[in-house]
From Swiss-Prot:
One of its GO terms (cellular component) is cytosol. Keywords: Cytoplasm, Gluconeogenesis, Glycolysis, Isomerase. The gene is pgi. GO terms for molecular function: carbohydrate derivative binding; glucose-6-phosphate isomerase activity; monosaccharide binding. Pathway: Carbohydrate biosynthesis; gluconeogenesis; Carbohydrate degradation; glycolysis; D-glyceraldehyde 3-phosphate and glycerone phosphate from D-glucose: step 2/4. It comes from Geobacter sp. (strain M21). This is Glucose-6-phosphate isomerase. SUPFAM superfamilies: SIS domain.
Amino acid sequence: MQKKQLWERYKNLLYHDAELELSVDTSRIDFPEGFLEEMEPRLQQAYQEMEALEKGAVANPDENRMVGHYWLRAPEQAPEAALSEEITSTLAAIKAFASSVHGGNIAAPDGHRFTDLLIIGIGGSALGPQFVADSLGGPGDRLRIWFFDNTDPDGMDKVLSRIGTALKQTLVVVISKSGGTKETRNGMLEARRAFERAGLHFAAHAVAVTGSGSELDGTASWESWLGVFPMWDWVGGRTSVTSAVGLLPAALQGIDVERLLAGARACDQKTRSRVTRENPAALLALSWFHATRGKGARDMVLLPYKDRLLLFSRYLQQLIMESLGKELDRDGNRVLQGIAVYGNKGSTDQHAYVQQLREGVHNFFVTFIEVLKDREGPSLEVEPGATSGDYLSGFFQGTRAALYEKGRESVTITVRELSPVSIGALIALYERAVGLYASLVNVNAYHQPGVEAGKKAAGAVLKLQGEIVEMLRRQPNREFTGEEMALALARPEEVETVFMILRHLAANGDHGVSVTVKDKIWENKYRSKG
């Protein structure tokens, strides 16, 4: 296609909203003639399902729950007045709490103001807050923000070492809907120990975001934590960033959460349109459907040309893959749906994997994110007539053109600048696109049975570990290979898991297990140190 033809196609397919200062360009998705018209009946059905969801229909039948993350930025849309009031009052409480922390009315036990903020959560309880913090944070932050987002001891030690002596002025926010998420519980216990070792009272630094009546809620109440904010069962983790999960950390960091919500709210209004060409989320969903053949046949490579959007791909990995990656459709048919999402940032990726994107296996489509404003203030000319930002823009445009020249399709999303409003709009745009696409391919976007299966399997491993440690302690003079231990436990089918547990136990001194190394690793012998 000639450049002039591409320009006409660009004008024909471009969505631009002057109020949001947001554009969605699908001109480099090769929709065949009549594709949009052919998909229109399915889209109209998707719009109806989305409208019913927003009105309070049970959209997650597995758990008999409503799905209400859209109400978080438009409380008046909630189907019950009590829900509207709870959303409104929670936002007011978040803002009041953050203001009290910033003003020193809520302070560390020594009377000094809090300077640091440690967020403990995993999955949606970390990815959304991390994305918002990284994209909008800066030298003017009211609190320095840190995260425990895994159960990796070394990772937590690294964070604590960076906090250092500021621990005594660190506020801790523990985020878990059920209060029983093991990674988050472990992080809380590790943080508690760090505070106690420093001679500090953990509860005097702690805040919870959790479900009413949860184990965490009970702990916070019993120990008189500084505050408890709600997580509602009608908000899923991956769509919780505009709830207390994301708003409390952002407000404490000093981000304008009202503007974040305003951006999401404005985008929600645009994406409720049933006129497909005037609905940017629908255009995204159609692009995904065409590019992946509606069956996940291609991956989504996310290339934001902005360092502050580095974490956007991680955030979207969960939002898209956990929502769409399903074995069964809503009718119980085995479909193996999903879209794999990965990416880093431009122009770094041009010196990494773009070589394969242009000339290697064609199993992807690209989403470019363009931010027009380079920085606050004037830029240096790195050569006559060109700044570093000009180069970044040039590399984006060049990569887009080079890929399409080879038949590699792409979508480009453009915002004028990064701000709470534009970040809120991007969050809302993708939440709606995921919901519409799920309707198009007939999957439930609001449950995650595979995650639960993984949790159960992990629990079985920990139970088996307990049996192994007990066997070693009962027979301190006996050495076991992995195979011998599996037989001793009458679990011969679990020999590989037994071997991996023994190897891990011996590498750490916590359980008192030693190893005698043999020529073949699977013949290593393990015993209790007594």
